[in-house]
Amino acid sequence: MKAEIISVGTEILLGDIVNTNSQFLAKELASLGIEVYHQSTVGDNKQRLLECFDESLKRSDFVITTGGLGPTGDDMTKETAAEYFGQKLELHKPSLEVLESFFVKTGKKMAENNMKQVYFPKDAIVLKNNNGTAPGAILKKDGKFIIVLPGPPREMKAMFNESVKPYLQQFTNEMLVSKTLRLYGIGESNLELEILDIINEQTNPTVALYAKELEVTIRITAKAENEREAFKLIKPVEEKIKSRVGKYVYTEGDISISEGETALEDAVSKLLVEKNLTIAVAESCTGGLVSSSLINYPGISSVFLEGCVTYSNDSKMKRLGVKRETLEEFGAVSEQTAIEMAEGVAKGLKANIGISTTGVAGPGGGTKEKPVGLVYTAIYINGKTIVKKNIFNGDRRKIRLRATRDLLNELRIQLEKL
């Protein structure tokens, strides 16, 4: 079965808001074994939406729309879908009762234009909205159908899960199941070279790579009658991949991550909590980014003792006990200073682990010997200190971000050895 997703709204078309609805729907439809080959975004324009319906239903069995179900004049998705199928709208009394009850409970007066939200084609399946005023609907004709859902993600997701998903399950006898591996420390090109034969030889399951900022995701997807059978197909492929690049895998599972974000910090924080190892952080060039990454994880307060930003030499000496001679001989950006920072913050707080960053984030301040992008990171753990030197490319933001993630990944590796 084939479906298409149409996002309706000029605000999406202009980039004023991020369209997360399509991502959610694509994943949900895939899990039902429904194929999605096209997604479209249309502004608040009836003629263009009619054209989009026509093109989509030539290629697919049904269309799901989000947005355009509000009370204003430019909310026209339902009306346009009805026009496309040649169906007239009429008052849906159960929806009117729900709408009137909503306004009574909230103590607000219902505007006249809210009435347009309770008109539907006679044979439409009306979908109750438990989180807003705009019901959805399923409009059908000649074996094709259009599902119209509200635009606000909270309303759309609830309506899909409560009403649409059960409706669609009658049309599917297979399901798609995916297993996700998230990797750090290897680029997409090198990863592809490592597992290219696995990618090429697979039909079910399939293997796909997705590059994000500073990390790569491997998605293994199988089609089967049920989840158990799908995972049976996935397991040998997953094991084969891990035998080659397993050292780069920092977490697995279908975790939804926004562009530019990562689950790496959660993986590290989880290890710290599970192993009950306390940690203290001393930062210079990253300016608190390491600490803020770790404390996003629920329960981290049981092991995270302190994070300090020691930007100046004076603060490095006073707060961390970095020797004046070290700073004078080697400089603030040096292996020796990074080591003393990590050891100083750990010993001062009696933490099991101390980590540190010091570097030149730019755009100025670099020299031939110490260029912009030079960063030293150190980890004090089990009485030993591991120090790394990196020269990162990019602007100030990216250098700080890469330094943070590289340090967290190295910490993950050390924790997994314990």
Curated annotation (Swiss-Prot):
It holds the Pfam family CinA. Disulfide bonds: none annotated. InterPro entries: CinA, CinA-like_C, CinA_C, CinA_KH, Competence-induced_CinA, MoaB/Mog-like_dom_sf, MoaB/Mog_dom. It comes from the Bacteria. Belongs to the CinA family. PANTHER family: NICOTINAMIDE-NUCLEOTIDE AMIDOHYDROLASE PNCC, NMN AMIDOHYDROLASE-LIKE PROTEIN YFAY. This is Putative competence-damage inducible protein.
